[in-house]
Amino acid sequence: MNWTGLYTLLSGVNRHSTAIGRVWLSVIFIFRIMVLVVAAESVWGDEKSSFICNTLQPGCNSVCYDHFFPISHVRLWSLQLILVSTPALLVAMHVAHQQHIEKKMLRLEGHGDPIHLEEVKRHKVHISGTLWWTYVISVVFRLLFEAAFMYVFYLLYPGYAMVRLVKCDAYPCPNTVDCFVSRPTEKTVFTVFMLAASGICIILNVAEVVYLIVRACARRAQRRSNPPSRKGSGFGHRLSPEYKQNEINKLLSEQDGSLKDILRRSPGTGAGLAEKSDRCSAC
């Protein structure tokens, strides 16, 4: 599995995340993916071949292994990390869409040179407006995926600890046989570590949702007490209604000025208009 590609995608989201979101990403890649790739995969690498039952009955080992380990720990954690990391891509797509709109506005304003476009790509987008909702929804989905996988893991392996010996009487085993699990202590340590890291991520997600809501409420209260001035720059200002209205007024004034210049340069047309206005006043 190529975890480097996933890290490259999420590192772009990290630039636009909160401080808690950056900590969450560090926990994901340092304490979970690195441990999963470096250590856990080697510990669980021989789980099927080293699962031995004291019987020579063909198929008994495979049936007992499937009964006690319906899904491998490593594969379950890999699926969990992929699904938990996917909602963050919503934020990356939203930011890319906003930057695309800003680049189009710069081109319409005549600032479409590569320097300005590269500056748009580098600057940090503030979490506000529709981006705030996208960010909160992504964090909530991360939280739900983490909690769901914790519950699924509890249903599959209630004790969390890896047992050394299991007794199996499933068909085609001739009777109740003893089956031995390889490296039970190592597997227990890594299981507890991964579950603890998942619990930390759940706490970070809850803290980030609370932080985003509190900060949004504080900003709204600040706007009510101190109305924002019309001056400003940046992406949010360019998309504000005041900015759009000012641009429209500017275009209208330029068109009005050009029309007056045309009337000045055409005396006949100006005289005709003056004559029409005199007739209207006489009427």
UniProtKB/Swiss-Prot annotation:
Gene Ontology CC annotations of this record: connexin complex; cytoplasm
BP GO terms, sorted: cell-cell signaling
UniProt main location, coarse: membrane
Domain of life: Eukaryota
Described function: One gap junction consists of a cluster of closely packed pairs of transmembrane channels, the connexons, through which materials of low MW diffuse from one cell to a neighboring cell.
Parts of the chain on the Cytoplasmic side: 1-22, 96-130, 215-283
Subunit structure: A connexon is composed of a hexamer of connexins. Interacts with CNST.
InterPro entries according to UniProt: Connexin, Connexin32, Connexin_CCC, Connexin_CS, Connexin_N, Connexin_N_sf
Pfam families: Connexin (PF00029)
Keyword Cell membrane belongs to the record: yes
Transmembrane segments: 23-45, 76-95, 131-153, 192-214
Protein name: Gap junction beta-1 protein
Compartment(s): Cell membrane; Cell junction, Gap junction
Residues annotated with Phosphoserine modification: 233, 258, 266, 277
Gene Ontology molecular function: any one: gap junction channel activity
Family: Belongs to the connexin family. Beta-type (group I) subfamily.
